[in-house]
Amino acid sequence: MADLQVVASSHFLAIIYARFRMSARLAVESMAARAAARLSRLAGAGGGTTIPGKLLWKLDPGAIDALAARLPQGAAVVSATNGKTTTTAMVAEILGERRLAWNSSGANLVSGIASTLLAARDAELGLLEVDEGALPEVLRRVRPRALLLANLFRDQLDRYGELEHIAERWRACVAALPPATALLVNGDDPQVGDLGRDRAATIPFGLDDPRHSRAEIQHAADSRYCVVCGRPYEFLAAYVGHLGDYRCNSCGHSRPDLLVAAREIELRGLDGASFELVTPNGTTAVRLPLPGLYNVYNAVGAAALAQALGASLADIRAGLERFGAAFGRFERIPVGGKSILVLLVKNPAGANEVIRTLEDSGAPALLLIALNDAIADGKDVSWIWDVDLEPLLAGAERVIASGDRAAELALRCTYGGLAEDAVEVQPELERALDRGLALTPPGGELVVLPTYTAMLALRRIVVERGFVRPYWERS
């Protein structure tokens, strides 16, 4: 008996010692990574949103698991091709007073997630925007209590491969989720809406207002064919790209019933949108400060996730109505008596919706478009030929083409009907910005359409000039 007690005591002490060693190791690794973040900021290399996470990942990939496990209320994860930064920011606004581990800078790869968890020492809840390609690794390590999958569009084919490849990886992710994990899916996306069909804890969301359907599905739409039998879908309503109300007349596969939806949508150009938000907990009218149908999608997804995390309908409405744009996404920047309106474009579906929103407000006479081909943009820029630029160019008097691929962008504009002498090619973004502002009258607004890395470069310029604070200080 005494021997058994000795063995039990030894085993208990071994567990305590192992946990102490693990905790001590994590503490040392965390100190090193936080020091890297401070050095990054002091050196002007950014906000320390990825470097600490890269270091922590190299030192110990399991540290992410340990940091996530410390969150008292667990974590929620948001992934999508388009809108994940805005949707996550909306959820943060709705949750308001909760202490969040939130990657508000948009650093959404594994390194950014690690940096976020490392920096949020007293956080209650993780709120993590995750790159669609990084989702499997993040889910394995964070084990969220709620997962929002908002859409899949063709984007960065050189990096991700075909859309179906990402969809299959997501399907495997969903199959591995614990039954208690809340799954929220955009029911209007055929690839995404089907992911939760066999799960009890699935909440489909979407739009329910055929008045805003396009006359026909866009030629650049990505999911035209039934995910079950491969036959073409019939779209009863097509809202944004391939998002809409669909059914297969061959096998009967169709959009799932929406549990959270936007109805009675009214678009007010660049001034925003209003809609009736329908949820299992009731219905409320929402006046959204952001424009465009795709921001209504973002808002409905955010509402669905916030409700799954315990937010009241009143909190959801209040949060959405006071929401300001995420950086680079319909962000207005005052510049000495003028302003810059920044609208991120990165793939055909997103760019077409930006153009649609600008059209509704009257296409601007002056545009600055910046096209880069860095890894984060996608090396293959052939997607610009799938964008319906023509309606925007029809109202333009001058376009300044900038970025790494300014020459190809200028060619696309001339093929779109703009006279050659109406296109100025200025690859250097700072000079292009100065030229655009010089052509903008006092009190006027310069509309800038940048790809992702061009948007970051633009922000560096306006930060250096003192027009805005760095995004990591705004967070």
Per-region residue spans from a language model:
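Phosphate-binding loop of NTP-binding sites
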Residues: 17-206, 210-225
